């Protein structure tokens, strides 16, 4: 099957044409639409060829059912950072980026129905340490700072997010935890959730992931033969990663 690729003067791909049947002139075209700054704004797959080959010069993705079902759409802010993405058949996904351009918050259609956002907060080295859900953040405040975990307190977790020992430099409204990740050392073993877990192997784990705390979204209670045998899954599943002297995972 023949595939033809067309580019503009900047080298951006604007059309990819698959020749399905050369004799009958059957083709499947995918168009790539850019803005004046060269940022990809639309991808129009072959399912939209009836629209793209018509004499109509403009289309509205908000009112065209075909575009909502099949088109890829991307929107950027004045810093050229992605703030909205729409994939075929799905509701838009919104992003809020901090001053470094890191997407800290995002919201898809399902989260929007519950007025919730997903947060992803790194440490000062850019490693993901906190992921979870919260109510609508202060977008203006997020855009003006480098959002990260600025301190850890594993002895007194009252001021940390969901008892993780992590304290970010931005307020989260009604947060819930999905995952917390730990690096470099094993000080987090002081947390109540890690009670009974121990590390083994090398003491030097700098630069390596040493543990995780993952939330159990729907705790399940199993009833045994009697009420005394009732068991409930924990609200978090915790794990510790140990390394040998050559930084290989030991357990």
Predicted feature descriptions by range:
Residues 1-251:
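Beta-strand elements of repeat-based all-beta scaffolds
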